[in-house]
Amino acid sequence: MENTNLRTKTLRDGTTAEELFSQDGLSFNDFIILPGFIDFDSSKVNVSGQFTKNILLHLPLVSSPMDTVTESSMARAMALMGGIGVIHNNCTVEQQARMVRSVKLYRNGFIMKPKSVSPDVPVSTIRNIKSEKGISGILVTEGGKYDGKLLGIVCTKDIDFVKDASAPVSQYMTRRENMTVERYPIKLEEAMDVLNRSRHGYLPVLNDKDEVVCLCSRRDAVRARDYPNSSLDRNGHLLCAAATSTREADKGRVAALSEAGIDVLVLDSSQGNTIYQVSFIRWVKKTYPHLEVVAGNVVTQDQAKNLIDAGADSLRIGMGSGSICITQEVLACGRPQATAIYKVARYAASRGVPCVADGGLRNVGDVCKALAVGANVAMLGSMIAGTSETPGEYFFKDGMRLKGYRGMGSIDAMLQGRESGKRYLSENETLQVAQGVAGAVLDKGSVLKLLAYIHKGLQQSAQDIGEVSFDAIREKVYEGQVLFNRRTLTAQSEGAVHSLHHYERKLFASKL
């Protein structure tokens, strides 16, 4: 019997998504996905997903723009692993732009305007550049121009023991004839391969006049080897997103972020269906057409329609479902997350707009369900809070190593910066109503290991469902081929750990 016949479901044993979400508002724990037929290894599963219309992520995960989750360290880690980080905006414009630049420069790919000096520059200048900008390899060119004729290169190791700081770098540089160079044009992968085979730290790429076109570094080649699925722009830099509010004053923030090099602008609002956001989307798409715009948050199709009509490239779905969010409790407004994702994402898909599941995700199973019922990628907050890459310091309480984690609608966050209040349209109010809480979470170690665990978990989830990608799963969900079951409270209890005196829970183990 052929595998295609084994994969066909001839008995209707389960509930379709359309039936499942036809009435009640459901969260992830309220249903389970029924298994399919397996004829492939889990390593063959492609978990990639569209973050925006033009940006595909190898790992369909995005870190939330919260001031206790995503700054430059988290954004770098997310992009290295194939996802993307959204740097929060509860800070000054200058601080946010500086964090964006830190991410964009972490892996350079082709350095299009490499730092260069003239041959008569003193050694002291090179040392100052190293201490101020962290650059350890500087080209020496005619006139000191970044696109001038190459004369040599001076590295930190060349001048470590030079006592005369006034001596010209020409005395200590590695000369052009002793350098490995390549001719333009060359593909980034080819340039990295040359660096791997050479024993030099840098590879200048020159035109036929021996003038510098760009530069590649060994450090970037190592990072390319260690993180082959990194999210990169066309120049080989890490992808980076940043959040902003949608008031008139925020146009200056967008200008600074665009100059810093962001790839995606995330409009941060708990309720995105406003005249402010509609107008802001139109302005951004007209003024900065190269920027991808993620709009939201939304939980209904009508909300989604207005933002898509305005020009949104992606939508964030979720209102009041996060672990530190109390919007539904305080304001009686929102929607259960699984239902919101299914309803909004199905409409958005008909318009060619991808969606981000934002909130309510507690484990790999929840992420799998969110992706299965419509989301293209998942935004993580509490799941990655407490990792070493998040902002803040660890502290101990009752013998546990903890890190602070708070909602952007908490009083603590709104008092720290006015931008957090803008998210909830309350920055100018004398009395601010909290829509979030502040708390702490356990130390989770490095997010790099946690993301690898989530990636493998998603692959195994898709394998059990019987499909080789989440695109295929969503297609089968919409066709009624992937089926579900509602879960009673006792069924949920049965599916959790039970009937044990005690147990130890470890999420994953690495085999060396």
From Swiss-Prot:
Q: Which residues bind K(+)?
A: G320, G322, C325, E494, G495
Any one GO CC term of this protein is: glycosome
- Where along this sequence does the record place binding of NAD(+)? D268, S269, S270, G318, M319, G320
Cell location: Glycosome
Q: Which GO terms are recorded in the biological process aspect for this UniProt protein? A: GMP biosynthetic process; GTP biosynthetic process
Q: What class of enzyme is it?
A: oxidoreductase
The coenzyme or cofactor needed here is: K(+)
Q: Which CDD domains match?
A: CBS_pair_IMPDH (cd04601), IMPDH (cd00381)
Main localization is other
In chain numbering, where does the motif Microbody targeting signal fall?
510-512
Summarizing activity control, the record says: Mycophenolic acid (MPA) is a non-competitive inhibitor that prevents formation of the closed enzyme conformation by binding to the same site as the amobile flap. In contrast, mizoribine monophosphate (MZP) is a competitive inhibitor that induces the closed conformation. MPA is a potent inhibitor of mammalian IMPDHs but a poor inhibitor of the bacterial enzymes. MZP is a more potent inhibitor of bacterial IMPDH.
Q: Which UniProt keywords apply?
A: CBS domain, Glycosome, GMP biosynthesis, Metal-binding, NAD, Oxidoreductase, Peroxisome, Potassium, Purine biosynthesis, Repeat
Q: Which reaction does it catalyse?
A: IMP + NAD(+) + H2O = XMP + NADH + H(+)
Family (UniProt): Belongs to the IMPDH/GMPR family.
Q: Which PANTHER family match?
A: INOSINE-5'-MONOPHOSPHATE DEHYDROGENASE, INOSINE-5-MONOPHOSPHATE DEHYDROGENASE RELATED
User: Can you name this protein?
Assistant: Inosine-5'-monophosphate dehydrogenase
